[in-house]
Structure formats: C-alpha cells, structure tokens
Amino acid sequence: MAESHLQSSLITASQFFEIWLHFDADGSGYLEGKELQNLIQELQQARKKAGLELSPEMKTFVDQYGQRDDGKIGIVELAHVLPTEENFLLLFRCQQLKSCEEFMKTWRKYDTDHSGFIETEELKNFLKDLLEKANKTVDDTKLAEYTDLMLKLFDSNNDGKLELTEMARLLPVQENFLLKFQGIKMCGKEFNKAFELYDQDGNGYIDENELDALLKDLCEKNKQDLDINNITTYKKNIMALSDGGKLYRTDLALILCAGDN
C-alpha cells in the first residue's frame, strides 16, 4: 500500500497517515536510522517502478539523508517531501509552527484552562485557525478528518487529547527544543522540590530571573543534553508559556515533569 501511495502525484491526508505508520515502525513519532533508510529506499524504488522521476523536493531529501546514519525527520519534514494535498500541507507550513516560541504562544491560547492538554474540539479550532490564517477554508467534514488524523498521528498514548510534547511534533525537528528536555525530565516529587527551590520569593510562580537560575543549573548538570550557550533561547521559548511573565507550576511542569511519582 505504501508503494502505491509513494507513486501518487497527489497524496491525500489519509494516505499520508498510512505512509507514516508504515515507516514509523517503533511509533516514536520520528523516522531515524533503519526507518529513514527504508523510506528512502522504498521511495526511490516506487518512483522508478512507476517510471517517475524524483521531484526536486525528493532529490534534495535523498541527497541530504541517503548517506547519513544520524539523520532524523519528523512528520513535518515528510509532509514537505511528499506531494501532499495542499490544505493538509498548509497545516505544517503556517507561521505559528515556524518557531518554538510562536508555537508555545499558540499552545497557551488554546490550553486556556492550563490543563496541559488540548482536547478534540480545541484541536479542531486550532487547525481551523491555522488554515484561516493561510486564507484557506475547509468544510466541517474535511476539518473533522484533519482533526482525527492529527490525533492519530500525534496522540501517542491514545487518550484522545494532545499533550504539549505530542503537539510539538508539528514543529520541524531542528525547531523542537522540547526534545532537548526529554532526557532530563523529573518525577513529580523532584519537580515540586525544584520549583519550590527556585521560586525564591514563594509567590507561587517563577519569573524570568528565577527561570534563568534554574536553567543554568540544569545546563551544568546535563551538559550532554543542554547547551548553556542556548539558555536565552530556552528561556524565551519557556516564558512564552507564561501568563504575563508569571510561569506557574503547571506550565513549567509541561517542560520538566515526567509524571506524578
């Protein structure tokens, strides 16, 4: 099935979903190593079998990743390589998803109750707004299809809603700074202890200066994951979640807390 889709001149949203599932064998949300090489090999074979040339985007992709063992792409990158239907592709090209800071601000707009999740109806409104900003409108049936596909693509724990880290897979890999924090997340007890330590005035939130101190310490302790030279970027992206410069416990937990235990 993936072969016939890779031979198409236009790939629908549902076909794109099937292609992604075919190659993302471990369900990580990214293609890397053998998965990525399988995609490149099957793409070249499928196009050749159908007597089709690789598109310029495909050629660039193959040249960039074909000889690399350390390549890694997300859904966004694949959507730009394959001839995906225009309105679905626009969801990956919108301004709100070109930088992590803009993405965080958009997340804050839709996670209005600070629950740490965006549920189905909120996701539908989010996608509708993205398309409207690109001067595109789709009917309710198509919007529902896109919403359902986004949940299937990103909802890794199948709870019917998206966490920040799941939603962040809409970002290009190089823009997704949350990946840097995946390996250093704390359990709930450790996180609460850290929050109280850096909330130096005990007012229930962390301001920019307190966050700066926390990030510096995290960078010192986790040099393999975090680069102290990128503190300004980390801080700017995290503060985009704040409420008027006040970063509350639930907001910071989205970045640094792995769970309740």
Curated annotation (Swiss-Prot):
GO MF, one example: vitamin D binding
Gene Ontology biological process terms in this record: cochlea development; locomotory behavior; long-term memory; metanephric collecting duct development; metanephric connecting tubule development; metanephric distal convoluted tubule development; metanephric part of ureteric bud development; regulation of synaptic plasticity
PTM annotation (N-acetylalanine): residues: A2
Superkingdom to which the source organism belongs: Eukaryota
InterPro entries (alphabetical): Calbindin_Ca-bind (IPR051001), Calbindin_six-EFh_dom (IPR029634), EF-hand-dom_pair (IPR011992), EF_Hand_1_Ca_BS (IPR018247), EF_hand_dom (IPR002048)
SMART domains documented for this protein: EFh (SM00054)
Subunit structure: Interacts with RANBP9.
Task of the protein: Buffers cytosolic calcium. May stimulate a membrane Ca(2+)-ATPase and a 3',5'-cyclic nucleotide phosphodiesterase.
Name listed for the protein in its UniProt record: Calbindin
Species, as recorded: Homo sapiens (Human)
